[in-house]
Structures are given as C-alpha cells and as structure tokens.
Amino acid sequence: MGDRNLTPKQFGALGEQYAAAWLEEHGWTTLSRNWHTRYGELDIVMLNPEYTVVFVEVKSRRSMHYGYPQEAITPAKQHNLRKAACDWLLDRRNRVPHSAVRFDVVTIVLRVGRPLVHHIENAF
C-alpha cells in the first residue's frame, strides 16, 4: 500500500478508499465521497449504526516524519469543513434520516504490510 510511485492525489485517494472500507467493515454506510462545494471538498460522508451523519476528513501519510496527520487540519480548514457540511445537509439530494451530526478524522499511515488506522471521533 505504500507505493512510492503514486502521485499525492492518487495517494490521498488510496487513503480515502481504505478509510471508507474500514468504516464500512464496522457497519457504517457511505453516503457521499469527494463532495465539492465552494468551501472545499468533503472527503467522505457516512451514516454510522447510531444514525449519526458523520463528516469524515481523511489524512494519509507514508510515515510520521512530518508529525501527526491530523495536525494538517487547521482551524481554518475546520471552519470550511463545517460550512461545506451545512451545504451538504441543505442539499435535497442528501436527505437521510439521522439523529445527530459530527466530524471525525481518520488518519492512515500507509506503510508496508498493514496500514495503521486511527479513528478520532468528534475530532472538532
């Protein structure tokens, strides 16, 4: 999984794909992937088993040399993700019965062998 020949965009997409599959294995349902707004992109929108709509920001790295992946989610990025999430919730095509909304972060270190996954619930 840690193929050095991937472009940064391909590497990020691989991390998002792995995160979605990992969450689906835990009973979550994918509602949207790579949803674009004027505020940026929502990586993954999922419905968890408790009927919470979860906006999942995925950060992938090849190593921990540059710090924790979640450190890349600045307050400004969080602000834009909240605005994008509001747009997603207001879009009629995204109507889904839910009991709550939250923001999670999934970090993935794609290394040789098995990727290291860390799921941070209610990250911000």
Swiss-Prot record:
GO molecular function: nucleic acid binding
Xref: Gene3D superfamilies: 3.40.1350.10
Coiled coil: none
Superkingdom, taxonomy of origin: Bacteria
CDD domains recorded: PoNe_Nuclease
Matches recorded under HAMAP family: UPF0102
Entry similarity comment: Belongs to the UPF0102 family.
Record-given protein name: UPF0102 protein BL0935
Species, as recorded: Bifidobacterium longum (strain NCC 2705)
